[in-house]
């Protein structure tokens, strides 16, 4: 299944070189649609509209600021599933739980790629024959 993936980040980082370019070069767009909110393609679209059209959100918390926190609140209000990432050198990394740490942009892209692949596999399993396995019933 093709996912619409919203990429959320702070403007305090070089997001074009640290996030956008590496993700595009990895080829995540061939099977999915990346929504890069600060790219020319989406510059005239409201963030809320972009979030509504997304299936999941990838959020890099590195050097987070008030605008990023506002974006996160908006995504939460829209009940979007958010996967959080942070650079292991970020001074605030210990403030967060359930977060993917990365060491450099290659590590970030690989972890995002692995996450997306695992989500796509889960979706394939769930949609196969429209049969959902919720658990096993043990009858003695």
Mark where each language-model region is.
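Conserved catalytic or regulatory cores that recognize and/or transform ribose-phosphate-containing ligands
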Residues: 1-140
């Amino acid at each position: 299944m093709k996912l619409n993936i919203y990429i959320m980040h702070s403007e305090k980082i070089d997001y074009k070189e640290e996030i956008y370019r590496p993700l595009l070069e990895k080829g995540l767009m061939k099977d999915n649609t990346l929504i890069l909110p600060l790219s020319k393609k989406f510059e005239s679209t409201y963030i809320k509209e972009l979030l509504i059209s997304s299936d999941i959100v990838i959020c890099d918390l590195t050097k987070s600021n008030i605008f990023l926190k506002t974006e996160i609140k908006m995504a939460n209000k829209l009940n979007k599933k958010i996967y959080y990432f942070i650079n292991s050198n970020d001074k605030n990394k210990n403030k967060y739980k359930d977060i993917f740490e990365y060491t450099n942009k290659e590590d970030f892209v690989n972890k995002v790629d692995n996450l997306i692949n695992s989500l796509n596999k889960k979706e394939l399993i769930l949609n196969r024959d429209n049969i959902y396995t919720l658990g096993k019933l043990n009858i003695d």
